[in-house]
């Protein structure tokens, strides 16, 4: 392999479930104009959809969760994981055709696929048969109190061009970067989804924790790592609180 080929060697990825992050803003003014009975009927229809989608999780064929979002970027986020892009689209359409969707305004969305790269790969045999790898590629979304989502790119500018580094350089940098993430094991669950060719950024990062301050600590600590300091470019951050079937009616109550 030539030096140029070594430099341009692309990381190989293991790909799992497809992911949709769907952010919505409520049209509270129109929502308030409905009668209590109309609102209750719509809430009942929506919780029925959530229960229907939840069957896939019980069968190990996907996962989903819903969080209220803090701030004016959105009011809530649906995160859906499914084996195929078609299934993501079906769920998106099913929600868009629901009564509740008539009282929401699309705020942001992100389409990606759960991804593991060979920067940190180890072991032999078929990785898709490795239980540890499978648990990361096909995760059950946790019932954590808080979520943080943000998209990101690797910089390609002048001397800070990630894609002009050799595979060995990128692997060494990612190994150091990964050590920081692993130091938060038990405090933060992280799901990385790849989106090159799927959306406007290259990766989506979804963090879950029962202590919202861990998001700030983790992201801040990573800012000092070379991967983030030199090569990281970030989009908007969304932070939210978990909604359950029990707390959803309170969220929608007016």
Swiss-Prot record:
Gene3D superfamilies: Apc35880, domain 1. Fe-coproporphyrin III acts both as a substrate and a redox cofactor. It is an enzyme of class 1 (oxidoreductase). Pathway: Porphyrin-containing compound metabolism; protoheme biosynthesis. It comes from Bacillus velezensis (strain DSM 23117 / BGSC 10A6 / LMG 26770 / FZB42) (Bacillus amyloliquefaciens subsp. plantarum). The keyword Ribosomal protein does not apply. InterPro entries: CHDC, ChdC/CLD, Dimeric_a/b-barrel. Fe-coproporphyrin III binds at residues 136, 150-154, 177, 190, 228. Pfam families: Chlor_dismutase (PF06778). One of its GO terms (molecular function) is heme binding. GO terms for biological process: heme B biosynthetic process. The active site is at 150. This is Coproheme decarboxylase.
């Amino acid at each position: 392999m030539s030096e140029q080929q070594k430099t341009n060697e692309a990381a190989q990825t293991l790909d799992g479930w497809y992911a949709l992050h769907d952010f919505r803003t409520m049209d509270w003014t129109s929502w308030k104009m409905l009668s209590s009975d109309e609102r209750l009927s719509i809430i009942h229809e929506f919780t029925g959809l959530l229960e229907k989608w939840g069957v896939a999780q019980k069968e190990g064929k996907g996962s989903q969760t819903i969080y209220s979002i803090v701030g004016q970027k959105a009011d809530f986020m649906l995160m859906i994981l499914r084996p195929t892009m078609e299934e993501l689209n079906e769920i998106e359409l099913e929600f868009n055709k629901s009564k509740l969707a008539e009282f929401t305004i699309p705020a942001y969305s992100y389409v990606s696929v759960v991804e593991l790269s060979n920067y940190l790969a180890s072991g032999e045999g078929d990785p898709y048969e490795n239980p540890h790898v499978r648990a990361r590629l096909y995760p059950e979304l946790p019932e954590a109190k808080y979520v943080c989502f943000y998209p990101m790119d690797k910089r390609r500018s002048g001397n800070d061009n990630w894609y002009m580094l050799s595979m060995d350089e990128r692997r060494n940098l990612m190994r150091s970067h990964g050590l920081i993430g692993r130091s938060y094991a038990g405090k933060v669950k992280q799901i990385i989804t790849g989106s090159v060719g799927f959306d406007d950024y290259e990766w989506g990062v979804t963090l879950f924790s029962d202590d919202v301050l861990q998001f700030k600590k983790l992201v801040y600590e990573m800012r000092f790592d070379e991967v983030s300091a030199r090569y990281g470019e970030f989009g908007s951050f969304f932070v939210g609180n978990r909604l359950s079937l029990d707390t959803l009616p309170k969220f929608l109550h007016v």
